[in-house]
A protein has these predicted regions:
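Alpha-helical tetratricopeptide repeat
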Residues: 29-44, 71, 119-134, 161
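Helix-start (N-cap) detector for alpha-helical repeat units in TPR-like alpha-solenoids
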Residues: 33-34, 67-68, 101-102, 123, ...
Length: 250
């Protein structure tokens, strides 16, 4: 345990052997931090990544030197396609604990892979361009740009979500649903994904109801070799007119 006052290793004592600071409350904060870390780990194991991020951030609020929590947070960001955020957490982790730290391995793996570095740069550039197109109401161009982003970085959850939102606004409900399902495969309980999916399903249900109503308003019958389709109201009106004519001739 690192003493909050002098920054030295204090073991697990109630008082720092170096500066004499009272560490009893500090130890409690560390225990709470570890509890949040365990919760985040459990959520990550079932791919509730957004929920895991919330728990791990809480863990680091109570104890910023929780290296395991910070490294796991970086891994989750990486899994969600947020490579810059992942690197940021690992750099902080490596600064807090330079020795015997997996964060340094993660950083080296990315820095030694030029293709991955280029992917990171292109992802940022193209995603920001897609946002610019959205602000300019150039939705078609934004969709094209987002497809390029996701071909480079298929795990970028926010890319799938933005693409789904654009499809939703354009009425392409099946495409929107597919984009949201792709996002859900990465992060199962993301509230934004679930909210968008609920709206897509609502609109699909309305569309299905309208189609059924439209079909119910049509009737078809065979006339020789031809199938005649006409509005039901027209048929009913014609029948009523024929009845009136027959009454007149009586």
């Amino acid at each position: 345990m690192i003493c909050y006052k002098c920054g030295q290793d204090a073991g697990w004592n109630d008082k720092c052997p170096v500066c004499g600071a009272d560490l009893s409350l500090f130890k409690r904060a560390i225990r709470i931090s570890n509890s949040y870390y365990n919760d985040g780990l459990q959520k990550a194991q079932v791919r509730n990544l957004s929920g895991a991020i919330i728990s791990l951030r809480q863990s680091l609020k109570f104890y910023k030197y929780n290296i395991q929590a910070r490294n796991l947070l970086g891994l989750i960001y990486y899994e969600m396609g947020e490579m810059v955020d992942a690197l940021s957490e690992w750099v902080i982790s490596a600064n807090y604990q330079p020795d015997d730290n997996l964060a340094k391995k993660y950083i080296d793996q990315i820095h030694n892979n030029r293709n991955q570095l280029e992917t990171i740069n292109q992802t940022i550039k193209k995603y920001n361009q897609a946002l610019t197109y959205c602000k300019q109401d150039s939705k078609d161009l934004a969709v094209i740009q987002l497809r390029k982003v996701l071909s480079l970085n298929p795990k970028l959850v926010k890319g799938h979500q933005l693409l789904a939102l654009l499809y939703l606004e354009e009425g392409h409900l099946d495409k929107a649903k597919k984009a949201l399902r792709d996002a859900g495969k990465i992060d199962t309980d993301n509230t934004t994904t679930l909210r968008y999916l609920k709206e897509v399903n609502r609109r699909l249900k309305e569309k299905g109801t309208e189609r059924k109503k439209k079909n119910d308003d049509l009737i078809s019958y065979q006339s020789g070799n031809e199938t005649i389709i006409m509005p039901k109201r027209f048929r009913e009106s014609s029948m009523w007119a024929n009845i009136l004519l027959s009454l007149i001739h009586i």
